[in-house]
């Protein structure tokens, strides 16, 4: 059964870049947050219908787990650790993968607000996330979310035995992918 690697952290911390690098290194499937968030936002507006977004993701994970020979999945997510709906979603995902014989591991990415503001508008970010094309608006939302939610843990992570923290100001996406793969002994598909 496949495992799930949840890469989480605040906006523009490097989740997609690290997830992409990890997928290239391991051959795992890369399922970034905006693959579901963008279509839901196009229909209902950004931030609307969070229950629908969670249900869509659960349905996709359920179908993925039903596929024979499905590789492990890398999922990126802005997890508001103090938001009950986000925590409930993660609990459901953990239960789903564990019931199927897989495990869920968490990679928390951290970086300073000034660094993340600089990263808004990078080519990879814009290619994966149409909602980020208005860079000043995306930067304003980043600052707003920073003040509104707890987007990084502070020694109180609910799954400490499956938790790795990496500072993306210290490591490149490729270096983060190498550290993640080494930490959980993921095979290197690139060799």
Predicted regions and their residues:
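Conserved glycine(s) of the Walker
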Residues: 14
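Small-molecule kinase domains that catalyze NTP-dependent phosphoryl transfer to phosphate-bearing small molecules
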Residues: 122-175
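Switch/connector loops and helix/strand junctions flanking conserved nucleotide-binding motifs
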Residues: 113-120
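Hydrophobic anchor at the beta1->P-loop junction of P-loop NTPases
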Residues: 7
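P-loop (Walker A) phosphate-binding loop of NTP-binding proteins
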Residues: 10
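Short, amphipathic alpha-helical "lid/cap" segments that border enzyme active or binding sites
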Residues: 57, 61, 173-181
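Glycine-rich phosphate-binding loop used to anchor ATP phosphates in small-molecule kinases
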Residues: 52-113
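Conserved substrate/cofactor phosphate-moiety recognition/catalytic segment
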Residues: 17-65
């Amino acid at each position: 059964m496949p495992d799930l690697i949840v890469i989480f952290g605040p906006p523009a911390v490097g989740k997609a870049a690290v997830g992409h690098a990890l997928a290239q290194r391991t051959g795992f499937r890369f399922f970034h947050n905006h693959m579901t968030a963008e279509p839901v936002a196009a229909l209902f507006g950004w931030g609307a219908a969070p229950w629908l977004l969670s249900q869509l993701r659960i349905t996709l994970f359920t179908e993925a787990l039903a596929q024979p020979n499905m590789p492990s999945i890398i999922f990126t997510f802005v997890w508001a650790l103090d938001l009950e709906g986000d925590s409930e979603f993660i609990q459901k995902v953990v239960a789903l993968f564990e019931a199927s014989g897989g495990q869920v591991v968490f990679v928390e990415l951290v970086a300073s607000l000034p660094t993340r503001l600089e990263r808004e508008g990078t080519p990879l970010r814009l290619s994966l996330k149409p909602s980020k094309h208005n860079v000043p608006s995306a930067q304003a939302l980043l600052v707003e979310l920073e003040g509104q939610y707890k987007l990084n843990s502070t020694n109180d992570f609910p799954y400490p035995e499956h938790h790795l923290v990496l500072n993306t100001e210290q490591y490149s996406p490729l270096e983060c992918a190498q550290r993640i793969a080494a930490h959980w002994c993921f095979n290197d598909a690139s060799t």
